[in-house]
Amino acid sequence: QDSKAPAHMFFKVDDGWIAAYNMGEFGAAVYWFNSDGKKRRKLSDHQINQFMVDNGRIFAVEGLAHLGLSRGSMIELRKEKGQWSAEEFIPFPGSAEAIAQVSSGDYVIVTSDMRLRVNLEKELNILIPNGDWGSLYPNSAAIADDGYIYIGMRQFVVKCKLSISVQSFTFLVPDKAWLNTKKE
């Protein structure tokens, strides 16, 4: 991946920036750049979709869903002895598209077709094994005070109970006036 291309996503760190380039099936890369951009170092080929910080630790969810293949993970970005690294923290059975923090060390992960719950002890629970929303491209997740998680995707929002025991979901569909009805 050419690090001079526009970054898909970036994250400010104490000595510069972590930049993620994600071109889907055409490749990906994660780079560290110093503050003025003159120095850089490639960290990995992970396909980062979202960064998250928990108690000073930097995590990201990553993955690729393409032509029937879906793989992903949660990675941790760490600085040791002045050098940044990106290492897999826990693998997932699908492309990790979004993450939401339930509490410190406890997260909900949205994959291309599933909803997972993971923690820093690397325990993984599959809450919704087949969300059947892959073609809607989930891309964000938020936990609300009402006990629900809301998953943003193409033209829809999915509403799920945050509870581990309740594993159903509802599609929130906007009024027809809001839908993309342009025909080409």
Language-model regions, residue ranges each:
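Ankyrin-repeat and related helical/solenoid repeat scaffolds used for protein-protein interactions
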Residues: 108-110, 115-159
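A short beta-strand motif characteristic of beta-propeller blades
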Residues: 1-2, 38-43, 84-90, 124-131, ...
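Acidic, serine/threonine- and glycine-rich low-complexity intrinsically disordered segments
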Residues: 1-35, 41-75
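Conserved beta-propeller blade signature
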Residues: 17-19, 58-60, 106-109, 148-151
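Blade-level signature of beta-propeller repeat domains, shared across WD40, Kelch, NHL, RCC1
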Residues: 143-184
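Loop/turn-rich, solvent-exposed surfaces of beta-rich toroidal or solenoidal domains
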Residues: 90-117
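Repeated scaffold domains used in trafficking and secretory/extracellular systems
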Residues: 2-13, 44-56, 92-102, 134-146, ...
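Structural motif
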Residues: 25-31, 67-76, 114-119, 155-165
